[in-house]
Amino acid sequence: MATGFTRPAAAPKRPQRRLTWLIPLLMILGALVPTVVDLYTDWLWFGEVDFRGVFNKVIATRIGLFVGFGLLAGIVTFLAGWFTYRGRPDELEFFDPDSPVVQYRAAVEKGVHRFLVVLPVVIGIAAGFLGQQAWQTVQLFFNRQDFGVSDQQFGMDYGFYAFTLPALRLVVSTFSVLLVVAFLIALVGHYLLGGIRAGNQAAGVKGSITNYAKVQLAVTGGLYLLVRMASYWLDRYSLLNNSHETFTGGSYTDINAVLPAKIVLLVISAVVAISFFSVIVTKDLRIPAISTVLMIVSSLAIGNAWPIMMERFSVSPNRAEKESEYISRNIEATRYAYGITDDAVTYKDNWGAKGASSEKVASDSATVSNIRLLDPEIISPTFTQQQQLRNFYGFPKSLAMDRYVIDGELRDFVVAARELDPNALKENQRDWINRHTVYTHGNGIVAAQANQVDEVARDVGSARGGYPVYTVSDLQTTDKEAQELGIVVKEPRIYYGPVIASATDGADYAVVGSENDSSVEYDTDSSTYTYQGKGGVNIGNVINRAAFAMRYQELNLILSDRVNGNSKILYDRDPRERVHNVAPWLTTDSTTYPAVIDGRVKWIVDGYTTLTSLPYAERTSLSEATNDTTAQVGNSAQRLVTDNVGYIRNSVKAVVDSYDGSVDLYEFDENDPVLKAWKGVFPGTVKAKSEISEELMNHLRYPEDMFKVQRKMLARYHVDDARDFFTNDRFWSVPSDPSATEGQKDVAQPAYYVVAADPDTGKPSFQLITPFRGLQREYLAAHMSVSSDPDNYGKITVRVLPTDTLTQGPKQAQDTMMSSDQIASDRTLWKDTNDLFNGNLLTLPVGDGDILYVEPLYSQRKNQASAFPKLLRVLVSYQGKVGYAPTIAEALSQVGIDPKEAQDLGEAKGLKPESQNRDKPEDKEGKAPSTPSAPASGSGTTGEAIGKINDALNKLQSAKNGSNEEYGRALDELDKAVEEYRKVAGQ
């Protein structure tokens, strides 16, 4: 029954529509907020270190590339879609009304405007994200430099390959991808809109394509072929980077077959492109189709079959002769790329052919008196136990080596900064307030002379002897001896360092600054401190506090009373990370080390400029080339721009202040074109080499990673003759570490910093050294060293041993020492109660004609949490003889080298150790007694005092198997001899 009322129309579901848009909007905002917060806090950080120009330049470049690539991709996509839609047939007269094509077309026409907007936007955004990653390539192109060196095939300057070719490749690859996308849009679009009809032979339906579709597809294909022509042209230059079994670079086949083939294919591509463009007039796809088939056949025949046949029938039977010229190119280019040219490397051929007498070896005081006994890879726990002071202080797993001058003599030191270790905080120390506002910094630097221990460790179970002599270990070093060393620490507090930045939870920050002069930071047991440095970002305002609260997901940054108007936050405190942030174009060395410069503890970081390739230059993996047993022990890693490199220079020395975190970059290689290019990108960020102070220069080391890469290259590229290079019979190899633990037996032996005789002058020199063994042989083949002294920094010397003599290599020397009856017996006796550690096996050229192997042996009591390593014995191998004793002097005597004839053993004064073990008896000055190590460290006299020490040591050794009373008397006699020695030496 009619009621007279009509049902009201349903109201539009606006809330549901709004919800549909609101959810994606919230998701986008949720994704953007963390990014915006990170960008804002990074912007603040770069302002703190005065490198905001770097941040702005990188962001501006990336945004510009994002917009540029996005617009280009969006325009190409839009045009492809618009031309496709515009060229659709008016009527689908040959299609069944129920055909899916008809339905597709209806759907496309209904949403064509949305389609022509959404698809270009999506592809444009994707292209923008990909394109902005190439910011370094683009910036280097616009700031490109000449190398002054040209390749031997095309005569192009290396700058073309380093800066221009990558940019051209970027352009060509971009247009190639976009044209493929445009072709696919046209192909699929014309099919969906009816411009292309698929045939069906069973139904008697022929396929068809409209003239408009033919023209659009043909023009797109023709444009792609033009881009392909450019790619063929650039491929010619890329041939010079091809990798082969024997060498890298263009081979005989590449130059004489592949290179001409690229030119032929380029011409064919041009002809085929013309055939594609002819469709505009002919409206016939048969000609381009036939041309494409011919091009594919030609590509297979000319680009593949011809080179294969030349390689098989011409090159393979005569490879040594055919490849000789190209191997020579590879040798020359690789030496340039890795800085191992003849002007940088001095080869001493047939070194040691005449040998050296024991007397000459003993008189090699520059080496013998500086034999390193402290292994920085082993004694970190010793530093920790003796110099930690509090549980929250710590040292790196791998300590560092540096050098200082003592009484006019150069000595090497094991050095470490006493940093705050956030992972060592316990219980209430981990409370947010304590961790981030109280325990904020470390305190002091520790240095121990590397060739000394406090006294002789005669017994494995004794608590005396075998420990470092800490020349510098207090919180604020101002004593006379430290001043003589040049170690005067005016500001010992350490807010920045690798250990302090090693928090496992990633919360690497400290909140400093206080109101009303109320200090809360722990400094010493009796004092607190308030940070006064310029480092850190101010978080006194609400915006910054909120930003960092979101960054670290920590509400306490907003709610805590410890955060006030004067508060600053210190973060990103790893020195290598800070250098990498301000110089993202630098690869940083895997190690950093502390030095006292101008009264402050500074972290020195080596920076490398790299290229992925240069013509004919061998490429290598940085991570593989630098991997050795020390790399696996330490807690550091490289900050890599790229792992695979074909060019490297140690072009920058970076210094990070441990107190305020400031970063200074110094130009070190003034001839590096890559550095010059980056200085053009970021002007004013790198200081001139002339601004490096003398004090800083005296602490710069030749970097380990650079040395290891050069070591890997020199193992092969010391060979001059191309035929010898081809046969490999003159190659060397880096020995595996014979002192490594069981799981690292095949890992390369590290390079070691030592003070030893300069290869030319014979004077003490701070060097980085490594041995080479023959290829697949254990005999020593060569010895490589490089100086870190300012006068001849970077001078590489390779001592090449004669091939007609056999000199034990590191593994053979190790096996010889370990097979000694006394050593084997002692190890068997001790291993049940002690952990034994073989220290660094040093391969030392001595007497300008012989090799001396020295290895310290450390012991540590088992199952004792408080135990730590001590030097127990010294092993020596010389001319096949083995020395094994508690002191280096005794060990040398056992192999026929009289330590009394080493001049520095009689003249150098040992340093007074600071109080380092409260359980040790003290002398009148309140310091623990020190046993010199000429004996144990290389100090002493040539007179009666040293003779009495040796006599006492012999008696002590004899009394070892006697009664306790005899042993005690011998020990007393040794103490008297040592005291007499100290008086004579003036200690």
Swiss-Prot record:
The keyword Membrane applies. Belongs to the UPF0182 family. GO terms for cellular component: extracellular region; plasma membrane. InterPro entries: UPF0182. Keywords: Cell membrane, Membrane, Transmembrane, Transmembrane helix. Residues 904-927 have a biased composition (Basic and acidic residues). It holds the Pfam family UPF0182. Residues 928-943 have a biased composition (Low complexity). NCBIfam families: PRK00068.1. This is UPF0182 protein DIP0733. The chain crosses the membrane at residues 19-39, 63-83, 115-135, 176-196, 212-234, 261-281, 290-310. Residues 904-950 are annotated as: Disordered. It is found in: Cell membrane. It is a multi-pass membrane protein.
